[in-house]
Amino acid sequence: MTDIKMIALGGVREYGKNFYLVEINDSMFILDAGLKYPENEQLGVDLVIPNLDYVIENKGKVQGIFLSHGHADAIGALPYLLAEVSAPVFGSELTIELAKLFVKSNNSTKKFNNFHVVDSDTEIEFKDGLVSFFRTTHSIPESMGIVIGTDKGNIVYTGDFKFDQAAREGYQTDLLRLAEIGKEGVLALLSDSVNATSNDQIASESEVGEEMDSVISDADGRVIVAAVASNLVRIQQVFDSATAHGRRVVLTGTDAENIVRTALRLEKLMITDERLLIKPKDMSKFEDHELIILEAGRMGEPINSLQKMAAGRHRYVQIKEGDLVYIVTTPSTAKEAMVARVENLIYKAGGSVKLITQNLRVSGHANGRDLQLLMNLLKPQYLFPVQGEYRDLAAHAKLAEEVGIFPENIHILKRGDIMVLNDEGFLHEGGVPASDVMIDGNAIGDVGNIVLRDRKVLSEDGIFIVAITVSKKEKRIISKAKVNTRGFVYVKKSHDILRESAELVNTTVGNYLKKDTFDWGELKGNVRDDLSKFLFEQTKRRPAILPVVMEVR
């Protein structure tokens, strides 16, 4: 009898961080190894990856890591996974080249080279499953769905996808192949849910291209385009419009340079004239109406860069009168307030702003109708909605019921849930560790909720430092309390509070020194408690308080 388990270490009840495990007997297949970028309250965190403990404990079972596409939410955790687990990595040509950029940039994995290029005709036979692939449509070329064939039926993972009948070559979904997979029999479908709550018509990429061309054609001065660097379909549209209107394209940002150069080398991006791309230092050689500045980076980075441009702090570009800023990325809900602030700054600097979402519904993910079409093609026995917040997964589940999938065969997972197939279907049998692992610089997992809470306090209420010198032996204060603050109050207007705080500390320490017993921790705790109470009464704020008590022997 074949034993089958399904586990989501990421990508459920959240956006990004796609990481799914399919276990068949003693074999483990990893579907995507993605990261996500931090939320607003995760201060100082660079990125977030899944908890890999379970995979590391079972690394001898791993048959391979199979990548659906080249975005960070599918490949970004690879360096951290490969530092612990040695396994072959499979993906399309572009996906593998972009994965190499991530892997080679990490000192722990820069020598790793067990990469394998596959395409929609590839079949790889393992002891416990046959892995194959099918073409999908997304905002990056050569995205693919993944099929694991078992004697119980196919297990299908879509990755990020949508249907676009007007998609250009390299972005087309293979509908015939999907129908064939459905005829073979699909045991379980793990399907993209990001856009499941919407039935709005998604603009085709040809419509998006026409809209972009119109915007650039109407612009009299420089056009500054803000895009996600790995959204290659959007970057190709920028190149096409630039060529059509006699403009040169300036790439700013290391990510944009690396990704675009890689895609050009592989001919996944096409330009008709190598002179189209110019260096930032050469901008002064051209008139404003001859330039498009492409500010492309990771998710959220283009908006941060626009803020610097508008404030005059960007390395290469300062927004000026006549500039048009064209935002062709869809900001996350968490970034909407920031986008509004940046728009204000741009207008103050003399520029103007257009968002691609003003006139078009743009997405790289299937809407409700597309999801139902996919389910009708594949006819899965079981559905696991993945890739989305809970509301998206629940909407996907409802869509599945409408096309005839039994409610008891639809499973909305929590991260770490172990789903085991038996005679009654997939049943929940416990879980594995699946908490977020936060990366801060080179520190992996050292940033927890306590650290984030402290950072939040520091960012909102600042820090209050008080230093005092005592003689434990003589039971007296040698040097009275001195106070310093950062981010708490404006010192020039708060002399009274600081003076009274110092006097309070002198009193607290003086009273403590009269006691027969002496404990450094207790003394600092008393100072912290008394100060905290006083400062809250005076300011209604609770800064982080750092008492420094020094001893003279």
UniProtKB/Swiss-Prot annotation:
Q: What does this protein do?
A: An RNase that has 5'-3' exonuclease and possibly endonuclease activity. Involved in maturation of rRNA and in some organisms also mRNA maturation and/or decay. Has an overlapping but not completely redundant role with RNase J1 in the decay of mRNA.
Query: What protein name does the entry list?
Result: Ribonuclease J 2
Under the subunit heading, UniProt states: Homodimer, may be a subunit of the RNA degradosome.
Which GO annotations describe the biological process of this protein?
A: mRNA processing; rRNA processing
What is the deletion mutant like? Essential, it cannot be disrupted. Depletion experiments show is involved in decay of Class I mRNAs (they decay rapidly in exponential phase, are difficult to detect in stationary phase). Involved in an early stage of degradation of Class II mRNAs (more abundant in stationary than exponential phase, show biphasic decay kinetics).
Q: Does the keyword Hydrolase apply?
A: yes
What cofactor does its activity depend on? Zn(2+)
Q: Which gene encodes it?
A: rnj2
According to its record, what are the GO cellular component terms? cytoplasm
What InterPro entries does this protein map onto?
A: Metallo-B-lactamas (IPR001279), RibonucZ/Hydroxyglut_hydro (IPR036866), RMMBL (IPR011108), RNase_J (IPR004613), RNase_J_2 (IPR042173), RNase_J_b_CASP (IPR055132), RNase_J_bac (IPR030854), RNase_J_C (IPR041636)
Enzyme Commission number(s) of this protein: 3.1.-.-
**Binding locations of Zn(2+):** H69, H71, H138, D160
What Pfam families does the record tag this protein with? Lactamase_B, RMMBL, RNase_J_b_CASP, RNase_J_C
One of the entry's Gene Ontology molecular-function terms is: 5'-3' RNA exonuclease activity
- Induction per the UniProt record: Expressed in cells (at protein level). Part of an operon including SpyM3_0658 and probably SpyM3_0659.
The source organism is: Streptococcus pyogenes serotype M3 (strain ATCC BAA-595 / MGAS315)
Task: Kindly list the places in or outside the cell where this protein is found, as annotated in its UniProt entry.
Answer: Cytoplasm
Annotated substrate binding sites: R361, V362, S363, G364, H365
